[in-house]
A protein has these predicted regions:
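HhH-family (HhH-GPD) DNA N-glycosylase catalytic core used in base-excision repair
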Residues: 1-268
Length: 268
């Protein structure tokens, strides 16, 4: 177990921020994260966080995953103090971080997210992981299922995916998995693209609209200018930014501000 003291890090806020569907609270101040084929249990008491994982995994995977090298107080300090709404949102969600998650997992997760609530999204992802992922055992003895590879999903049938409660989204997942396997879309190339270029490429995938493309850019490519607009965000923009969100002021971190707003609207 590794014990780290840090600021602007709150497991509860991250878990409820809508960006990660395989993070769950499993006890008082205790959380579990499955990312790709990795497993982690964490506890937090104020600013003290305990990571139950090998030190090697923490250094080479979880530091990047939780964006621990970034000082999020700088984002909070960027908020215009005259913007009372965003100031309140930043204060409420000051422990949120933009997780650096696996691109493939984010593409499939946000395809599944369409017209879905968080509970159902999590269940769908758990279903496909159990059906098509590899069963594994963590260093602490916990059994879990890795997120399925593109190859595993490409070999599935639409009916099998529908049996995982994906509904009409099954055809989106199957089409995307096969495009990745056949080389019609390169995940590595997406990592090298600008936000605008990556967004345009993602919009070419079957079933991907603007919100889903922006979610993938923000949470799968860590492109912090992406600003996904769902119902919660649209309502906030209409109520508090009738002249439009101040994009120029927050250039380079619009996605961080989006998360503060999303969490604030969700928790009000």
């Amino acid at each position: 177990m590794l014990t780290i003291e840090m600021d602007n890090f709150n497991l509860g806020q991250i878990c409820r921020s809508g960006q990660c569907f395989r993070m769950d609270q499993i006890g008082d101040d205790r959380y579990r994260v499955i990312a790709g084929d990795k497993y982690l249990e964490l506890t937090q008491e104020r600013g003290i966080v305990n990571f139950s994982c090998p030190e090697e995994d923490f250094i080479f995977f979880w530091i990047r995953y939780f964006d621990l090298d970034c000082d999020y107080s700088e984002y909070i300090n960027m908020i215009n103090p005259r913007d009372k709404y965003l100031t309140a949102a930043g204060e409420m969600g000051s422990g949120i971080r933009i997780l650096q998650q696996d691109l493939w997992e984010m593409i499939i997760s946000f395809l599944i997210s369409q017209q879905n609530n968080i509970t159902r999204i999590k269940k769908c992802i758990e279903n496909i992981s159990r059906e098509f992922g590899v069963r594994k055992t963590s260093s602490t003895g916990a059994e879990y299922y890795a997120f399925p590879t593109a190859e595993a999903l490409a070999l599935a049938t639409e009916e099998q995916l529908r049996e995982c409660n994906l509904g009409y989204r099954a055809k989106y997942v199957l089409d995307t998995a096969r495009k990745v396997c056949f080389g019609d879309i390169s995940l590595n190339s997406l990592h090298d693209m600008t936000y605008k270029a990556a967004r345009k490429e993602l919009l070419g995938l079957y079933g991907v609209g603007e919100k889903v493309a922006d979610c993938i850019c923000l949470f799968g490519l860590h492109q912090l200018d992406a600003f996904p607009v769902d119902t919660h965000i649209r309502q906030a923009l209409d109520a508090h930014y009738k002249r439009g969100f101040p994009n120029r002021r927050y250039k380079g971190c619009r996605g961080v501000m989006q998360q503060y707003i999303f969490y604030y609207e969700l928790m009000k």
